Amino acid sequence: MALWAGCAGVASSRQTVLTISSMSGSKNSSLRVAFQGEHGAFSEAAAIQLLGESITAVPRATFDSAFRAIAEGAAEALLAPVENSLAGSVVRVYDLLLESNLEIVAEIILPIEHHLIGCPGATLDGLQSVASHPMALAQCERFFLSHPRLKRVPAEDTAGSVRDVLASGNKSAAGIAGRQAATRYGGAILAESIQDNAENFTRFVLLLPVHREGAVDPLHSPIATSPAVTDLMRELPARLAERSQRPPSLKLSLALRLAHKPGALLAALEPFAHHGINLLKIESRPIHGTPWEYQFFLDVQTDAPTQLEAALNELRSATSFLRILGRYPPALDASA
């Protein structure tokens, strides 16, 4: 079952706010949304921006654990990053998505700003070490070149690095994370926006369980049937459409496998060109258990759902495997 059957509208990554009530039937509880990381992480900030302040954010240590959260009854939805404008795709998320019975129902693009955060009273001159996720450290290379005395300390999570610094009370240590981490843990921002590239954005997707054959048991989540899930599926398209600032459009993510022969990829892409479907992204990933053979992940976009269905019908005959990973309105470009 797909949430988006047609061009329902466009999600605004800056303006979309949706408050969801209980997923369990109680008016006093809120939608539980799993994410990878600690409280104060960019994923949590994206979930709150997309779904509203009333959600209950469920932090998990790893992507694997986050994907299991729904099956384990710890959450009803999952918010996961799939792509960064500088670092590229989050390949583990794509692998887990393909193994699961979760489907993309919405997306949001979040600007990524890295701040240097320390204990209250700490100063930049007094720092000796800076901790954060390796990707965040790498995206702040110019800052470290300007402050060569600072030791870089890899950490599991951006927000977690700030939490640990604040818990230690060590004024000679700091972490790199988003502003929300400083707010969450009471940290002081010692230097703002220290990332090398201001055009740094991460695309996050909201995932819900759907009926899907072939899902691996540990990731096969029960299909949510509570009133709040029904409300989410009913209200989200209209709310996103209300905030659209361009003609309604439909985005579709899919995975496919092809015969190992010349021209197979060209034959698979021709239906999109023939029907005027815009190919936004194509990326290959190894097929687990089949060395040197690959599957492809695609994102396409159109304002003509009928043409998209025609293209998909033609695509099925050109592929050995085809799975729709989600239909949803494209998020507005956060850099606009």
Language-model features: where?
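Domain-level signature for soluble enzymes in the chorismate/prephenate branch of the shikimate pathway
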Residues: 2-336
